[in-house]
């Protein structure tokens, strides 16, 4: 599923693509792949990289394209309620595409937030930074829930040692490790992006500082 988003005091969905809009793709199907690779000429290798669940935060280039991969938190059903997943931001001079192979809460919330606050996102660097900032906000939200779950599991273990409580605690602790690794990786990406987007038009030190502070707060 893809959406074409234009920044008009926040991101507003439109019916078709035009240069400099943001194309957000979640759970891409064959139609989305064809649009991205045939119409926008997005490198297929980038889409394959984003599909790898183990991809770490990094950047890559091909011709005039830049791929930025960050990791974001995801709440799911099952024995492991929280995981982290990759999301790819693919850009060139006229195109901004985000691709995620899962349906997330973060992206719709981010879009709604820009509308509520009337946020203007003037360029691709700021969009990437704001998405990283949003990831930190959601990491913090889920970390609070995880810490509450850990405290509850530890309390249960004090009463009686049961295998299911011990396994639950181990899974939650493993999730914390994954979260911390992803947050640190995203923080490193901010520095890399600053070195890539050095032109004056891309400079926004206040936003960079806010992103780094939020990531450090999320780091457990």
Positions of PLM-derived features:
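Peripheral, non-transmembrane regulatory/ligand-interaction domains of membrane transport proteins
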Residues: 1-219
């Amino acid at each position: 599923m893809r959406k074409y988003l234009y920044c008009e005091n926040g991101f507003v969905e439109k019916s078709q693509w035009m240069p400099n809009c943001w194309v957000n793709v979640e759970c891409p199907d064959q139609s989305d792949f064809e649009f991205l690779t045939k119409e926008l000429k997005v490198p297929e290798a980038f889409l394959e990289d984003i599909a790898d669940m183990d991809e770490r935060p990094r950047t890559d280039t091909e011709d005039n394209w830049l791929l930025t991969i960050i990791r974001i938190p995801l709440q799911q059903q099952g024995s492991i309620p929280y995981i982290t997943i990759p999301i790819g931001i693919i850009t060139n001079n006229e195109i901004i595409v985000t691709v995620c192979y899962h349906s997330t809460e973060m992206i719709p919330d981010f879009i709604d937030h820009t509308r509520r606050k009337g946020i203007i996102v003037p360029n691709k660097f700021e969009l990437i930074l704001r998405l990283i900032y949003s990831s930190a906000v959601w990491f913090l939200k889920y970390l609070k829930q995880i810490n509450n779950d850990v405290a509850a599991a530890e309390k249960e273990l004090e009463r009686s040692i049961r295998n299911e409580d011990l396994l639950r605690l181990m899974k939650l602790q493993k999730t914390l490790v994954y979260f911390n690794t992803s947050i640190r990786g995203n923080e490193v990406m901010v520095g890399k992006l600053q070195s890539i987007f050095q032109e004056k038009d891309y400079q926004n030190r206040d936003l960079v500082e806010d992103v780094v502070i939020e990531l450090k707060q999320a780091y457990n």
